[in-house]
Amino acid sequence: MRPSTRFLRSVTRTVPIGFRSTTVPFVSSTLRSSAATSNQFSARFSGVRFYADEAKKEEPKDENDAAAAEEDANLTEEQKKIKDLETKLDAKTKEASEFKDRLLRSVADFRNLQEVTKKDIQKAKDFALQKFAKDLLESVDNFGHALNAFKPETLEQSQELSDLYTGVKMTRDVFEKTLKKHGIEQLNPIGESFDPNKHEATFELPQPDKEPGTVFHVQQIGYTLNDRVIRPAKVGIVKDNEN
């Protein structure tokens, strides 16, 4: 028997009959309200217990999901790290390739610079005497002028003049030999075709027995220094009769 029913009966017994008509409705209403409150509390309590039980049941599942999510997060983070490392590796590889290309270019430039410098040094060495040699050429010419001043018949008549001639000639020969040792050589183009890069034409004359445009007379001998013309030869060339 429910407590509300017992309470109703006890009240009914204790209350006088005259008062039952007015008291019973009030008591019944009160009891119904109390019963409803009790039922609502029971329902709420049972709901709380239900949710608590469900929470306890779902707690292991949630923990598993959290662990899986954390594992996924860790995997994703590792993948991000791997991707980041791959990106950095690609960048470093590209940078290393650029450095290698720069190094190869620098080595090539350095070798070219070495070759150019070597050639420049050799040129400077070869032509360092150019100005000095040009200044000496006038002295060599003077030896030639002195020798040409001697007449053959005079040399035969005077031993002293013959000895002087021989001494001057020997001095000139030694001088020219020394110049040749340092790359300075004579340019005597007699009988050669006229070359404006090596010869300087001072006059033209027709020569019946010679080919036009050839050198038939050398007015002044030219000189070269290591195959570079330092003084062109002054020449007379054969003129073409048709012109």
From Swiss-Prot:
Keyword terms: Chaperone, Mitochondrion, Transit peptide
Molecular function GO labels: adenyl-nucleotide exchange factor activity; protein homodimerization activity; protein-folding chaperone binding; unfolded protein binding
Region Disordered: start-end pairs: 56-79
Gene Ontology CC, one term: PAM complex, Tim23 associated import motor
Compartments where found: Mitochondrion matrix
Primary subcellular site in the record, as a coarse category: mitochondrion
A GO BP entry: protein import into mitochondrial matrix
Pfam families reported for this sequence: GrpE
Disulfide pairings: none
Described purpose of this protein according to its UniProt entry: Essential component of the PAM complex, a complex required for the translocation of transit peptide-containing proteins from the inner membrane into the mitochondrial matrix in an ATP-dependent manner. Seems to control the nucleotide-dependent binding of SSC1 to substrate proteins.
HAMAP family referenced in this protein's UniProt entry, alphabetically: GrpE
Membership in a protein family: Belongs to the GrpE family.
Self-association and partners: Component of the PAM complex, at least composed of mtHsp70, MGE1, TIM44, PAM16, PAM17 and PAM18.
Name assigned to this protein: GrpE protein homolog, mitochondrial
